[in-house]
């Protein structure tokens, strides 16, 4: 019969289990919940943005910096991990920070573990929006990940991209390499593959996971579990042409929408314009005739005396 576990042994086993779960869930944590991608409101301009060392809009330093690795705003003296020893019970503000991350542009506290591990494990290392190709330093908003293709997205394009992400770049759901129905879909390549053509010599399939895409290696998903479509949806701020300064907005989108909406009625509009032009010409002709008649009526009773036109001028010359 096994020995009964003591209280200290139970606590140690529970602690080891919690640490194991934390290590396992650290790689699968949501990008929006990372401390380096947390929401921050500037103390000076009151504008909400991503967690940064300096405000993106007014370049002011925050009163309570947030560590990009552990997310704390206060460093306690009890923790012996501090690189910079502080005399007080705790330290806040600039006395707590130790570095600025080059990837996420956020403060890192002066803890030895955070300083040595954050730069290698920063989730925003290659965070460039797949739609507008802007990085962390190019805009002030937070970074998100598409729930389908897992590419990085900025705040401006996250909803529009995810609304149009489940669209294949093909007219059918057939496999790219053959005519059989594609049972697995890669949402990065926007293509379907059958069971035979998902097997790749380059990318190996891990246990308990879906087969990788033979083109890019991204994990595929079953087509039946997705709301896949083969139509091309044209909407959003990225569909319009760029302006002179390189920026694109919603003006081109609304113009395209209006042109598509009234494209079917253009033929009828042209006919109506022709009829209106003919009516205007007829009205002008009638108006011209009426004006001539009115002018003739005005000059009928006008008497200019004896003139050459009246035929009496030669009598006056003879008298003289």
Curated annotation (Swiss-Prot):
One of its GO terms (molecular function) is zinc ion binding. Its main location: nucleus. One of its GO terms (cellular component) is nucleus. Residues 1-23, 206-250, 264-303 are annotated as: Disordered. Residues 10-22, 216-225 have a biased composition (Basic and acidic residues). Transmembrane segments: none annotated. It comes from Bos taurus. This is Zinc finger protein 330. Coiled coil: none annotated. Residues 269-287 have a biased composition (Acidic residues). A motif (Nuclear localization signal) lies at residues 3-11. The lineage of its organism: Eukaryota, Metazoa, Chordata, Craniata, Vertebrata.
């Amino acid at each position: 019969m096994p020995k009964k576990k003591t209280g200290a042994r139970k606590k140690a086993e529970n602690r080891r289990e919690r640490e194991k779960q934390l290590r396992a869930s650290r790689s699968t944590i949501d990008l929006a919940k990372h401390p380096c991608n947390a929401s921050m409101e500037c103390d000076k301009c009151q504008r909400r943005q991503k967690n940064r060392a300096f405000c993106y809009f007014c370049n002011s330093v925050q009163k309570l910096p947030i560590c990009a690795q552990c997310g704390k705003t206060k460093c306690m003296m009890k923790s012996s991990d501090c690189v910079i020893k502080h005399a007080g019970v705790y330290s806040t503000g600039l006395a707590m920070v130790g570095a600025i991350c080059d990837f996420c542009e956020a403060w890192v506290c002066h803890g030895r573990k955070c300083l040595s591990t954050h730069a290698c494990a920063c989730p925003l290392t290659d965070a460039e929006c797949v739609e507008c190709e802007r990085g962390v330093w190019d805009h002030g908003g937070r970074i998100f990940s598409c729930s389908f293709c897992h590419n990085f997205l900025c705040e401006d394009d996250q909803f529009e991209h995810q609304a149009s992400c489940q669209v294949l770049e093909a007219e059918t759901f057939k496999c790219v390499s053959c005519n059989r129905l594609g049972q697995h879909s890669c949402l990065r390549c926007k293509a379907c593959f059958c069971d035979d053509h998902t097997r790749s010599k380059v990318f190996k399939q891990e246990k308990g996971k879906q087969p990788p895409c033979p083109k890019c290696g991204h994990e595929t998903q079953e087509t039946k579990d997705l709301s896949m479509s083969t139509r091309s949806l044209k909407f959003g701020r990225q569909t319009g042409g760029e302006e002179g300064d390189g920026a694109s907005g919603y003006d081109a989108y609304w113009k395209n929408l209006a042109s598509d909406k009234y494209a079917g009625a253009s033929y009828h509009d042209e006919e109506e314009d022709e009829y209106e032009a003919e009516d205007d010409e007829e009205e002008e002709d009638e108006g011209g005739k009426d004006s001539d008649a009115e002018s003739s009526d005005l000059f009928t009773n006008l008497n200019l005396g004896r003139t050459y036109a009246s035929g009496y001028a030669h009598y006056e010359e003879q008298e003289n």
